[in-house]
């Protein structure tokens, strides 16, 4: 789809403040302006890409007086001359008449933008999912909403106040490059490489966003249903979260041991925010964990409809109050939630990603609160704790109070890149045989997909020869969830897996083997 181009114009009328705007379809603007008593519109030709038009409009608005048509033309030409494609340019003045023929009755279309941020290229799918018949040019509808100040439009990528390229969708200031653009024809179009998996953000692509309105839900009591009795440490953590709700502090850390039940601990503060008429986002870095959390949240809050957003599921609506999503999906939220619970903050891909950190915080309303849950807080969190900037609570033990298993390091000669005749070392075979004899299960982790294909296949093949049922699971496995269910129900003895199964899975009587543990990268 070609990038939209925008006409820069000035609208005037008796007793009215001159209005400087930009539009991809002047017919919509003429109808709206005429209905609001504007009589004349002067626009600059040719139309420009969104970031150039936006820059010109911003500078023109600093002139606090009505401009004569030719003066308006000269100012626009001077502003965009060094960067715009204006080899041939002129201006035209139109007389406005109040017909209203171009104005649409948009109903609740505005609600689709509440608390969200969308690229212009995402509008057709957005309107279609909301049950609207998509118009030939979806920007006709958004232009009317922009004029009515119901949504905001900006260039997805542009220059900030310091003259640095910045992606206004993901907040990145690096990883942005200039290139010839097939969509707008510019020779120096900015493109963000950080969030491109969610759609191409460029300086010629419009970005639409709007904050979620306050007081949108009626207050009603919500109580979580827990199928377990909290330990004293868990109860203390839940009470600390409740006190945090009253403190006015922006963020709180739940520092809990692996398997410490931190997810259930957060249900109390979630219920409180929902009771007060607020909205909650439960964000997880990995989509596999999202799938596992769906039934737990549904069981805990049966009275509240759960919306799920991941790479596989999209059940969100504008009226959703409790949302479970991957951290990548938070890129499409804007000042939307009163509470964000970020689970497994130490996990890839959230850990080390400035884009996802920015997205999660931007998903919060200005008065919103952030709860971060992790077993391994990073150095920045520890420094904030030491400086008293980050309140926190610890859950030092699991509910059964048994110590965490300490890994045993076994030195085994393994070829870095095993060939087809590779066979599992004796120590690996012995461990898997013990798993079978003790009626337990096993996960065998490998650091790379390449090793998974060779070593994993060899281990599964060896297992078949002695009656051990095994399977391979990775991000490329179509039946990954099925393999996990088979292991849970005892239909498989072991799974050879990539790091896809390192989180979000709880299995009784499980042994874990990590092969090639000396690999520095996975």
Model regions and ranges:
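Conserved interdomain linker/interface between the two RecA-like ATPase lobes of SF2 helicase motors
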Residues: 117, 124-126, 248, 389-456, ...
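N-terminal alpha-helical interaction blocks
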Residues: 2-161
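N-terminal pre-P-loop "Q-motif" helix
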Residues: 226-249
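Conserved motor-coupling elements within RecA-like helicase/translocase cores
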Residues: 292-337, 474-495
């Amino acid at each position: 789809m070609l990038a939209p181009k925008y006409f820069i114009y000035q609208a005037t009328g008796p007793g009215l403040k001159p209005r400087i705007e930009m539009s991809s379809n002047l017919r919509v603007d003429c109808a709206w302006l005429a209905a609001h008593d504007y009589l004349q519109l002067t626009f600059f030709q040719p139309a420009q890409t969104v970031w150039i038009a936006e820059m010109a409009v911003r500078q023109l608005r600093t002139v606090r007086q009505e401009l004569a048509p030719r003066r308006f033309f000269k100012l626009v030409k001077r502003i965009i001359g060094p960067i715009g494609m204006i080899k041939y340019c002129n201006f035209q003045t139109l007389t406005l008449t109040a017909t209203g023929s171009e104005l649409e009755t948009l109903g609740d279309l505005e609600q689709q933008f509440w608390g969200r941020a969308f690229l212009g290229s995402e509008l057709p799918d957005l309107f279609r999912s909301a049950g609207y018949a998509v118009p030939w040019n979806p920007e006709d509808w958004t232009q009317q909403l922009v004029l009515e100040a119901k949504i905001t439009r900006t260039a997805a990528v542009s220059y900030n106040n310091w003259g640095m390229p910045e992606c206004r969708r993901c907040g990145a200031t690096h990883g942005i490059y200039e290139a010839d653009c097939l969509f707008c024809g510019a020779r120096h179009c900015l493109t963000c490489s950080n969030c491109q998996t969610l759609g191409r953000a460029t300086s010629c692509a419009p970005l639409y966003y709007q904050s979620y309105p306050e007081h949108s839900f009626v207050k009603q009591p919500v109580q979580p249903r827990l199928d377990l009795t909290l330990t004293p440490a868990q109860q203390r953590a839940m009470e600390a979260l409740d006190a945090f709700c009253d403190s006015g502090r922006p963020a709180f850390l739940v520092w809990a041991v692996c398997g410490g039940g931190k997810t259930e601990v957060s249900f109390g503060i979630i219920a409180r925010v929902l009771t007060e008429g607020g909205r909650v986002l439960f964000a997880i870095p990995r989509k596999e964990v999202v799938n596992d959390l769906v039934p737990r949240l549904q069981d805990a809050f049966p009275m509240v409809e759960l919306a799920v957003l991941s790479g596989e599921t999209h059940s969100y609506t504008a009226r959703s109050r409790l949302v479970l999503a991957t951290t990548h999906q938070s890129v499409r939220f804007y000042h939307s939630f009163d509470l964000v619970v970020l689970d497994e903050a130490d996990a890839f891909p959230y850990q080390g990603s400035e884009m996802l950190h920015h997205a999660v915080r931007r998903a919060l309303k200005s008065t919103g609160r952030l709860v971060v849950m992790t077993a391994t807080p990073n150095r920045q969190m520890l420094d904030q704790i030491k400086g008293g900037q980050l309140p926190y609570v610890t859950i030092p033990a699991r509910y059964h109070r048994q110590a965490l298993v300490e890994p045993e390091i076994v030195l085994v000669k393994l070829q870095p890149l095993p060939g087809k005749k590779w066979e599992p070392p004796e120590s690996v075979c012995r461990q898997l045989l013990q798993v079978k004899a003790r009626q337990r299960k096993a996960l065998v982790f490998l650091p790379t997909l390449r090793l998974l294909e060779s070593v994993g296949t060899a281990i599964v093949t060896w297992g078949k020869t002695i009656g051990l049922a095994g399977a391979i699971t990775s991000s490329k496995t179509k039946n990954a969830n099925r393999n996990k269910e088979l292991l849970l129900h005892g239909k498989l003895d072991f799974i050879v897996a990539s790091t896809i199964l390192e989180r979000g899975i709880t299995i009784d009587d499980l042994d874990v083997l990590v092969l090639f543990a000396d690999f520095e990268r996975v």
